[in-house]
């Protein structure tokens, strides 16, 4: 059982008692996800592959097919191919919501249970939606920054891309700072890239002689931020707060690194939650339709070990 699932679902949801009864009940779940083109996606692929093995062991009649695609067009073609294999359910993290909505609709038209992960479709045709909490990531981050700075300080923000989930995170962060004397003195897009974040942080360091903390909402970008701070030799920055749960950052939290004292989860392992729920719906006939939003958990030294996956690429 994945450590991430501890406390997220009732123990009865994945009880093994009925597994033997399902041995002759053959079903197929297809998992369609982007190829590992960056760290977070690499983590998604890792957790999907690990969960596929766990589910096939839990339900002897189950076959799980994990298919990665390099772009939206390839993913649409993959969905068409997967439906020819007689699948009962599809777990899909779309490359692009607009491009994949109609191909997913076609799969659903073949009486296939649809679970969408992370990126919502243009039209909510899915049976189950599993995602991280984007506003929650901003809210939890703001609360931590306020407390860590004692309610007063100068913060720079490195945003992701100019899309909805970035707006949700940043708006919640700004709202969470209200009532304090913590000020956002600069904000730029880092495109969820460690190289771009490195350049943005270099600019911040040149422009601002005093920075108390950095919020960059993403652990890949935090890597670039840390390198920029190191090269500049700056000692005024008290800490950097990223997000997602990259193993390198979680390890720093575990080890008591003063520069990375915490992290906020937006876990790639959400795909495993989606797969678990989908299988439970197929085999245990549990009412799993609807939305399942994972908490934006604050990772500290006290709980970091529960979210550390040393074998994951992310």
Model regions: which residues?
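Gram-negative bacterial Sec-dependent N-terminal signal peptides
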Residues: 1-22
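A residue-level marker of the well-folded mature domains of exported/periplasmic proteins
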Residues: 3-4, 21-314
């Amino acid at each position: 059982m994945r450590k991430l699932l501890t406390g997220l679902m009732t123990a009865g949801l994945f009880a093994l008692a009925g597994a033997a009864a399902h041995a002759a009940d053959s079903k197929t779940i297809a998992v369609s996800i982007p190829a590992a083109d960056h760290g977070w996606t690499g983590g998604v692929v890792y957790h999907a592959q690990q969960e596929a093995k766990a589910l096939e062991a839990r339900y002897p009649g189950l076959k799980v097919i994990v298919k990665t695609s390099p772009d939206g067009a390839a993913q649409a073609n993959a969905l068409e191919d997967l439906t020819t294999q007689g699948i009962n359910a599809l777990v899909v993290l779309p490359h692009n919501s607009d491009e994949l909505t109609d191909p997913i609709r076609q799969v659903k038209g073949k009486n296939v249970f649809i679970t969408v992960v992370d990126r919502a479709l243009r039209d909510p045709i899915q049976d189950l939606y599993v995602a991280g909490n984007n506003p929650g990531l901003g809210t939890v981050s703001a609360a931590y920054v306020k407390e860590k700075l004692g309610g007063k300080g100068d913060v720079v923000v490195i945003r992701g891309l100019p899309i909805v989930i970035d707006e949700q995170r940043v708006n919640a962060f700004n709202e969470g700072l209200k009532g304090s004397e913590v000020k956002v003195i600069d904000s730029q897009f880092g495109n969820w890239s460690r190289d771009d974040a490195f350049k943005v942080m270099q600019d911040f360091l040149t422009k601002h002689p005093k920075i108390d903390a950095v919020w960059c909402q993403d652990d890949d970008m935090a890597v670039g931020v840390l390198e920029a701070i190191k090269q500049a030799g700056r000692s005024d920055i008290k800490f950097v707060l990223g997000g997602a749960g990259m193993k390198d950052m979680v390890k720093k939290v575990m080890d008591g690194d003063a520069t990375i004292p915490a992290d906020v989860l937006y876990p790639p392992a959400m795909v495993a939650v989606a797969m678990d729920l989908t299988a439970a719906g197929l085999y245990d006939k549990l009412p799993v339709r609807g939305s399942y939003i994972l908490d934006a958990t604050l990772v500290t030294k006290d709980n970091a070990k529960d979210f550390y996956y040393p074998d994951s690429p992310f």
